[in-house]
Curated annotation (Swiss-Prot):
Function: Catalyzes the conversion of L-arabinose to L-ribulose.
Organism listed in the record: Paenarthrobacter aurescens (strain TC1)
Cofactor: Mn(2+)
PANTHER family: L-ARABINOSE ISOMERASE
Record field: catalytic activity: beta-L-arabinopyranose = L-ribulose
GO MF term list: L-arabinose isomerase activity; manganese ion binding
Disulphide bridges, residue numbers: none
Pfam families per UniProt: AraA_central, AraA_N, Arabinose_Iso_C
Protein name (record): L-arabinose isomerase
């Protein structure tokens, strides 16, 4: 049976990545000062590496003191696929004209760390030698100027590295950079086309490859069916045994049960999907209930399990949401919680206690719960195929964010809504799908009105692993519009932001 780790493209571990730590100075101060700069900058990098909120290893590089070294370092970072970004700090004054060629050449995300070696001023001992050595307040302003002059997108983090908030912000940016690295090399396989007549799941795949790097291509679902029907019975036996070990399988699906063959067919779908995606080097995929060809079931539990292993997925041919799910899987990598395809399905409209019930036909990722899912089989009602097998569970309560990606003709638009996932008010005994119930920020009416006004999609990724800040950093790295709906959102201000953005992106597109 293909394993979850046999597809290198599907790796979600942040240990595969590194971020280079660059320190700026100049020869003006002499070798003794440069040695101190090197020692202290290594201490800064080591302190961040020791912090659990910083998930990607910082690799310290020798102090940069001239234009050629800076440019070469930028080019080396560009050429190294394991490098997902660079962090830069001007320990002393580093004349910024030296950084022009390097910054112009840099193609990796950039974090400007504005810090200094000492937290406190040595009030009684400070002299001008100390001032010359510890002048990031001076040097980083010069660096900030040249970045703005060149229009370099970056994140700026301010404070001493002993401050937990500094490490948290550095970690959030690293996660966003990892998501970006995953998207830049993503191969996405579509089985069939989009659901007929649906608007928001359409989009410009060529523009997506230019903007995000993702390669989106389509295969006949019957090619998938061939892989499914070619699965070895011994592999099916092993996978079914795994299902019974990991999940609460209803009796009718167990060996000897009346519907056991349906569980075996679901296992064949998983085996076929895995082998097909591995052969393509794909880490994301889509299906469509309208285009199932020779498949006997709409892929349900197979999709849920592949998402749990880090694959991106979009339903009804929605490749844009599949991109988001894959990015969220990588960004959340080692954190508790999960990420999944989600769809706003229906509402609870009790005044003052409004909630959104999210679900999908089958395909919600079990990473959203720490509880043991129940494996069930029920009619689907659409698609004209056999009853599909699926995992059923309630998403665990906690903070989350739902994010959608839409093609607005002249640009892609991300819309993110901060939410609180809550426990169900009452059981849902007749709803045989995985689901999530949440309260959107700032309130239901404002959230829904803003979402509709923005033209945001009905398919989203729900992440309970990373928050809005990571998606904000991701959008900045991707140079993609992001509209946020959070505790501070008002419709009046939100409409103004939409108008400002429309003007900005039209002007920026012509520059």
């Amino acid at each position: 049976m293909p394993s979850a780790t046999s597809n290198p493209a599907n790796n979600t571990s942040l240990e595969q990545y590194e971020v280079w730590f660059l320190t700026g100075s100049q020869h003006l101060y002499g070798e003794d000062v440069l040695k101190q700069v090197a020692a202290q900058s290594q201490e800064i990098a080591n302190a961040l590496n020791a912090n659990s909120n910083v998930p990607v290893k910082l690799v310290w590089k020798p102090v940069l003191t001239d234009s050629d070294a800076i440019r070469r370092t930028a080019l080396e970072a560009n050429a190294d696929d394991s490098v997902i970004g660079v962090t830069a700090w001007m320990h002393t004054f580093s004349p910024a004209k030296m950084w022009i060629q390097g910054l112009d050449a840099l193609r990796k995300p950039l974090l400007h760390l504005h810090t200094q070696a000492n937290r406190d001023l040595p009030w009684a001992d400070i002299d001008f030698d100390f001032m010359n050595l510890n002048q990031a307040a001076h040097g980083d302003r010069e660096f900030g100027y040249i970045q703005s002059r060149l229009g370099v997108p970056r994140k700026t983090v301010v404070g001493h590295v002993s401050n937990p908030e500094v490490a948290r912000q550095v970690g959030a940016w690293q996660r966003a950079s990892a998501g970006w690295a995953a998207v830049r090399t993503l191969k996405l396989t579509r089985f069939g086309d989009n659901m007929r007549n649906v608007a928001v799941t359409e989009g410009d795949k060529t523009e997506a490859e230019l903007r995000f790097g993702v390669s989106v291509n389509t295969w006949s679902v019957n090619e998938l069916a061939d892989a499914v029907h070619g699965a070895a019975e011994s592999d099916v036996d092993s996978l079914v045994a795994e299902y019974e070990r990991l999940y609460e399988v209803v009796p009718e699906l167990k060996k000897g049960g009346a519907r056991h063959e349906s569980l075996r067919y679901s296992a064949k779908i998983e085996l076929g999907l895995r082998s097909f995606l591995e052969a393509n080097g794909s880490a994301a995929f889509t299906t469509s209930f309208e285009d199932l060809g020779a498949l006997r079931q709409l892929p349900g539990m197979a999709v849920q399990r592949l998402m749990a292993d880090g694959y991106g997925f979009g339903a009804e041919g929605d490749w844009k949401t599949a991109i988001l799910v894959r990015a969220a899987k990588v960004m959340g990598g080692d954190l508790p919680g999960g990420a999944s395809l989600m769809e706003d399905y229906t509402y609870h409209l009790e005044p003052g206690s409004e909630k959104i019930l999210g679900a999908h036909m089958l395909e919600v990722c079990p990473s959203l719960t720490a509880k043991k899912p129940r494996v069930e089989i029920h009619p689907l009602g659409i698609g004209g195929k056999e009853d599909p097998v699926r995992m059923v569970f309630d998403t665990d309560a906690g903070p989350g964010v739902v994010v959608a990606l839409s093609d607005m003709r002249d640009r892609f638009r991300l819309v993110a809504n901060v939410v609180d996932v809550v426990d169900l008010d009452q059981p849902l005994p007749n709803l045989p799908v995985a689901r999530a119930l949440w309260e959107p920020k700032p309130n239901f009416a404002t959230s829904a009105a803003a979402w509709l006004t923005a033209g945001a999609a009905h398919h989203t990724v729900l992440s309970t692993q990373v928050g809005l800040d990571v998606f904000e950093d991701f959008a900045e790295i991707a140079k993609t519009e992001l509209l946020t709906i959070d505790e501070d959102t008002t419709i009046k201000q939100f409409k103004k932001e939409l108008n400002w953005n429309a003007a900005y992106y039209k002007l920026a597109g012509g520059l």
